[in-house]
Amino acid sequence: QIIEVYDPPGVRLPVVHADFYRLDHPDEVEQLGLDDYRLGAALLAEWPDHAGGFAHEPACLSIRIENAEKGRQAIVE
């Protein structure tokens, strides 16, 4: 499943988790109907480059996980 939705009361606001790894081309995002899920929700996107990226959107926060000397580190941009 590419899109999983988590609704309150389990979370404070709706969360849409999208794993775009299996997309072959960014145009495939339109077929998913992603905009139908996003209104009033937080979008957590894995492999956002497979979906064309989201950096152009307001309030976009990028978190990259990288291997570090001792475990992993999160880089927030």
Where are these regions (language model features)?
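Nucleotide and nucleotide-moiety/phosphate-recognizing core
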Residues: Q1-H25, Q31-L32, A55-L61
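Short phosphate-coordinating micro-motif centered on Lys-Gly-acidic
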Residues: H25-E30, D35-E77
